[in-house]
From Swiss-Prot:
GO terms for biological process: coenzyme A biosynthetic process. The gene is coaA. GO terms for cellular component: cytoplasm. Belongs to the prokaryotic pantothenate kinase family. Keywords: ATP-binding, Coenzyme A biosynthesis, Cytoplasm, Kinase, Nucleotide-binding, Transferase. It is an enzyme of class 2 (transferase). The lineage of its organism: Bacteria, Bacillati, Bacillota, Bacilli, Bacillales. NCBIfam families: panK_bact. Pathway: Cofactor biosynthesis; coenzyme A biosynthesis; CoA from (R)-pantothenate: step 1/5. It comes from Bacillus velezensis (strain DSM 23117 / BGSC 10A6 / LMG 26770 / FZB42) (Bacillus amyloliquefaciens subsp. plantarum). It catalyses: (R)-pantothenate + ATP = (R)-4'-phosphopantothenate + ADP + H(+). This is Pantothenate kinase.
Amino acid sequence: MKSKELNLHTLYTQHSRESWAGFGGHLSIAVSEEEAKAVEGLNDYLSVEEVETIYIPLVRLLHLHVTSAARRNQHVNVFLKHPHSAKIPFIIGIAGSVAVGKSTTARILQKLLSRLPDRPKVSLVTTDGFLYPTAELKRKNLLSRKGFPESYDVKALLEFLNDIKSGKERVEAPVYSHLTYDREEGAVEVVEGADIVIIEGINVLQSPTLEDDREDPRIFVSDFFDFSIYVDAEESRIFTWYLERFRLLRETAFQDPASYFHKFKDLSDAEADTMAASIWESVNRPNLYENILPTKFRSDLILRKGDGHKVEEVLVRRV
C-alpha cells in the first residue's frame, strides 16, 4: 500500500488549542511582550498568551525528551565502559513552508529552552546558510530553483550535523544574508558546547533521491534529529502571509541599496502583488507540494496554524 493511501493522522494524538494549554503543568517561564515581539519574524505574530498556551507545554514535552535522551546516553556509555564520552547535543529539527513562521517558532523555543531550570545552552542554526552561493547556483543553472532540494549543499549540512553528533566541541555553519540573497562571505555561525541545537529550514525533513545517493550511504538530515517539528497551515493562509511579507519587504529591506531586490523598491501595490504571486506559483507552491508537505508526517509533532499565525491544533506522534 502506498503511503498516501494510509491514514497517517492515526499515528498522532490530536489536541485542540484549549486542551494543549493544560499540558504546561507547573512549568513557569516568564516572557514579556517585548521579548515575544523581539523573536517575531516579519509579518508573524507572537503574543505572551501564545507562548503560554502553545510553547510552554511544548517546551515541557521537549524537556522530557531531552532528559530521557541524556539518561539513555549515560546508561549506554556505562554499558560500553565509556563513562567520560563527549557531550552529545540533543538536536531539534523544525520544518515547514516559506512564510509559515518556522523562524519565530525556532527563536521562541531557543529562548524558552535556555530558561529551563538546568539552564541548557541552546544554539539555533538555519539551513539557509547551506544554500549554494548565488554564483554557484548560476553556474549550475539553479537560481530559479533556489529553495528546492538541489539548491542546498546537503553534503556540507550532513557533515555539520555529523560533527555535532560525534561530539565535536566547536562546529561552524555558513551564514546567509536575506539582504544580499547570498551567503555572507567569511561569516560563520559557531556551535560550541551546546546542550541543544535547533536546526530550522524548509528542507530538514526531506530525503535525497536514489540518484543523489547512488555513490554514498543513504543518510538523511533527519537521521540526526532527536525530535522534529512541522509548522503547518492551509496553503491559502500561507500564500496570504507570503504576500503580506513581500509587501513589507518592499517597504523596508528592498529600500536598502545593498538589497538584492532593491530594483523592486518602487513597485506599486498591484505590481508587488503580481510579482509575489508569480514567485509563489513558480517556486514556493511547487516546492511546498513536491518537497515540503510530503514530509509532514515524518515529524514527531505538528503545529497547525490558523488565522493570525495562532496555533489551533497540536498533533503529537504516538511512536
